[in-house]
């Protein structure tokens, strides 16, 4: 094998990748990690009907803690599939960022904005104007 690439590197550990493919981590540009909590709840429906049912479930169980736990699950699944960076949008984005940090992932995230009341009854105007 050709080791010239690594001659001037100060690696703590050298791993032989002979016979394998080495590639950078993938980037998931559309992620709702904590939605992993609702997998299998509603399937094969048009988007509007699917959202209507999922939002009822979200309103019933989502808290900062359950969002964190769902994010850990969803982000771990991303890591296992090769994604090391995600762009996530979900309720309680601070909890999703904490989950990503705890797992060693890179993340970009933001809140949810639309013209319907969300978790906790907050409207778009409430989000724009601040806490």
What is each stretch, according to the model?
Residues 13-15, 27, 108:
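Hydrophobic/aromatic beta-strand patches that form the interior of the parallel beta-sheet core
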Residues 97-131:
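Metal-coordinating catalytic core of metallo-dependent amide/deamination hydrolases
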Residues 16, 28-30, 85-87:
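Short N-terminal targeting/anchoring amphipathic segment
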Residues 39-105:
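Alpha-helical scaffold segments that flank or form the walls of functional sites
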Residues 25-36:
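Histidine-centered catalytic micro-motifs
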Residues 32-34, 91-92, 112-119:
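Active-site beta-loop-alpha junctions enriched in small/polar residues
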Residues 1-23:
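Histidine-rich, glycine-flanked metal-binding segment
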Residues 21, 44, 114:
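Residue-level detector of flexible, active-site-proximal loop/helix-junction positions
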